[in-house]
């Protein structure tokens, strides 16, 4: 069953202009994420226009929607609730707020202060044994006399060295080293990374309070704090942190992300599925298009003469039309419309190759001839965009000829990225959902 589309009404007016701008912005953002070759500095997308030629639509089948369309996507809501809760917890305590602004992230604040993490338990016997140095008493004593704006020499035995920022924050708050619980100091002071460990001038033994490799691996999950990330040498030393089975294969317990025993990976629930309803339906539609859709781009080419990246010249590319032949999927589920295209092999499996042979009428650069020995244009690995017509212009023109003619590499790169964006973003299992 064929369908006639009033293309002018569907793509004009304020709604059509807004949709065209959204498509332009979407393609532009995708180009900003593409790694560019050395001879291209940047790619900008300036305009998009639907053109005047409407596509040919032919309904092939009504069927049940794909199971992928029933996945319940609630990550955004739950994520916002969690972030609000973390923010509320972080700003309840002024010490937590100071620590999160100066040193740590809010994720570290919500973790319990136990001996299994980088912040050790201050009431642990092992901790008190090695931190019984009297170095904490001078914090509320003689150093108060140092002027705030005068240079301060390094004082041996004082954690933090010559930095006066955290010291004045603690002294102005009326906190004394002999009166303040060590848990508050370790959890909220700017000396989080140095306070619990004795300084090089101290008397304690560092090996007594250093966490084991397994405990350190748990703390290393917080990758936002550079101080908590060990170097490659400390992460995988030869024969120190990795034990071996009798057969000689090492254990990877110091890598919590890739470990098969990670409870976060084992306890990950399967995606929630919405309930199917009788009114849900899906349409498979054969789409053929050979129109004048337009896309305007600018790629800045770098010239390496007389020196590398000497100057950049703008190359203007105008896509003046495309040739497309594929099967579209439109699914209606509970006030949601899911839209995508099928890959060539999936389309032939669902609608059959006999009803999917109209593409031979519009040959393009990626389309072979109709001879029996040539491969089908819809074999695996070929883009659904069979042909992209483009006009290029670089620099100024003299007597109708371009100053620089060797722009084929830039054209091929830009057009290849246009095909890749289309195939990766609009071909199943990728799809777009519209709320109606």
Curated annotation (Swiss-Prot):
Disulfide bonds: none annotated. Residues 85-98, 244-255 have a biased composition (Basic and acidic residues). GO terms for cellular component: endoplasmic reticulum membrane; ERMES complex. Residues 190-206, 222-243, 256-267 have a biased composition (Polar residues). It is found in: Mitochondrion outer membrane; Endoplasmic reticulum membrane. Residues 73-98, 184-275, 352-380 are annotated as: Disordered. Residues 73-84 have a biased composition (Acidic residues). It holds the Pfam family MMM1. Keywords: Endoplasmic reticulum, Lipid transport, Lipid-binding, Membrane, Mitochondrion, Mitochondrion outer membrane, Transport. It is a peripheral membrane protein. It comes from the Eukaryota. GO terms for molecular function: lipid binding. The keyword Ribonucleoprotein does not apply. Component of the ERMES/MDM complex, which serves as a molecular tether to connect the endoplasmic reticulum (ER) and mitochondria. Components of this complex are involved in the control of mitochondrial shape and protein biogenesis, and function in nonvesicular lipid trafficking between the ER and mitochondria. Mdm12 is required for the interaction of the ER-resident membrane protein mmm1 and the outer mitochondrial membrane-resident beta-barrel protein mdm10. The SMP-LTD domain is a barrel-like domain that can bind various types of glycerophospholipids in its interior and mediate their transfer between two adjacent bilayers. Belongs to the MDM12 family. This is Mitochondrial distribution and morphology protein 12. The lineage of its organism: Eukaryota, Fungi, Dikarya, Ascomycota, Pezizomycotina. The gene is mdm12.
